Amino acid sequence: FIVGGPVGDFELLLCHGTVCVVGKMRDLILQLSKSSIYSTKPGESKKRGRGPTSPGPLASLLDRPLSELTPENIAEWLSTERQNRPTVTAHAYRLLRAFIKWANYQKKYQGIIHGDLAQDHNVRKMVPISASKAGDCLQKEQLKSWFSAVRSLNNPIASAYLQVLLLTGARREEISSLRWSDIDFKWSSMRIKDKIEGERIIPLTPYVSDLLRSLMEIPNRGTNEENWVFRSNSKSGKIIEPCSAHNRALTRAELPHISLHGLRRSFGTLAEWVEVPTGIVAQIMGHKPSALAEKHYRRRPLDLLRKWHEKVELWILEEAKIKNNVDKR
């Protein structure tokens, strides 16, 4: 027998006691990852460039019924994929683990996959260790070249996005998901959707404020139905993949590769030059409290965060030789 029905955004079929995802696991994995690179099948046309795509790390699992997701199969899959792309495989495993947890929360499908499958010892020992790349951080002597190249980008939205990313230390998704309703120009604050606390309020520093005001002046901003600050022509309407713009800027500035997460890392590192208290930096960046006192006894007001955040911004701009905050693209 076959029973079909919608579960969230996903169509599932119950086939002889096993769950098979229509479109396989693809739709759910895409919803979780916001990117097709993990589940792309081989032979599909590339969205950028020419030629067919290579299979994503999850592609070999997409056609399996869930009942076949056993520790042995997952361990074998990890063993194969980790050989050529360990970091991407580790991320794909985390997406798969999230999928398994989701499936086990649905009453209709509980018991089809063992809930502790992803925690099996033989599976866990095959998961590649993700380590941050050495040097994935801007040095203070590189700031002038970086800002010059980023501000020269033809796309003002990508240019502003990259600068805001560096000057707030926020996660890339937190900044790309900003709506204009999250920006308070009157009280100089930004509301950020935080994966740790749900949301956090951080200062809207002077230079970042000017950057965002300049985006409001871009023509056709009214066509942005979702009210995204950093809009694009993508299906979601917001900026999704700014890496290409950043890579062009790095090439122009003759700087080594720095990831978008490296810009977040740069904020935390550069803040040490101004001797910002560690707890202040952590609260601005949205890190978990690392000590008992931080967790239970520190409730810093926005003005205190602003005092230090503006010092960091001013120091970075001075090192970048940007003397006038209004002097920008």
Question: Where are the regions that the model predicts?
Answer:
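C-terminal secondary-structure termini that scaffold catalytic or DNA-interacting sites
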Residues: 11, 16, 214-224, 231-236, ...
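Extreme N-terminal basic, low-complexity initiation segments
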Residues: 2-12
